[in-house]
Amino acid sequence: GQNYTQKYNKLYDRTEFYNSYGNLIGYAKHNSLYNRLEYYDANGNLLKTEQYNSLYDRKDTKDKYGNQQGYEKRNDLYNRNEEYDSYGNMKYTKKWNDLYKRYEIFDSYGNMAGYYKWNELYERWDFIEQ
């Protein structure tokens, strides 16, 4: 499957995302004025935003126009984060696997979609799609 990499760029103060060929495909940067995380494509066009919603104790995701796209919420009972679409349907879950030292991503049916693993040598997170 396709592999992706994310790495923090100190010079630009942002997290950058690369495809398996090493090409920049986008980046995320914190906007302190609006107190949110903003995601951009490689050309600098805003794609989406993430912002903590204290009323519902979750992270809301909105498109570039401000329309609700979904949210992420912590499920302490199952010790995982859950991602939902704007209608409240679960899209995927993310859970830490202590044995393999990685974040595993599962679809709404419980099938593993891939995982994030820290690459010590390159100081980055690698995503391996299943």
Indicate residue ranges for each PLM-predicted region.
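Repetitive, compositionally biased segments used for assembly/scaffolding
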Residues: 1-130
